[in-house]
Amino acid sequence: MPRPSPQQLEQLEGLRAVVLAEMMTLGLLKEGDHERLHHVPLGVLRSNATQRHGVTRWSGDGHGNLKVDVVDLNPHLLTGTWHDYAAFVLFHEYLHVLGHRAHDQTFRALESRWPNARASARGKAFTHARRLARASWHWVCPTCEERYPRQRKGSGRYMCRRCKTVLKDVPSRDIE
């Protein structure tokens, strides 16, 4: 796993402070939780990650108990454009650290308490931005002009989700 740069560590610590303060305000932290979350190591994912925005990594102690190793965030979340969404992703991962491992109804109810609804809804936009940044090809529908950014050629094997027309491969450098 990549190690965060000193600048990334500084940004992660700033995010931690923001998220922990908000969790205190929301009344989500029991006694000892603040200290526990404050000591969870923070890191970054590989820079080529497009689907994963954050992850809580666990290890077993040999007795069936789990211990948090690290909470990793996508390094592209640490840019100014995505700061609000980065705080939400860290909040999401902290809910996992507090014992809510599944994305069940209880987890979603806790997650919905994050005060910035706009930030929490930016996940699809972040994934799309990362896919665009990494795309070498666009699969383009000649009928409806829908575009699908991809890293590999489709070679005529895929159809448009909208109109079921075979998609054409267009190099990213040819896309305006």
What do these predicted ranges mean?
Residues 1-88, 97-176:
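Active-site-proximal or metal-binding-adjacent scaffold patches in catalytic folds
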Residues 93:
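Walker B catalytic acidic pair
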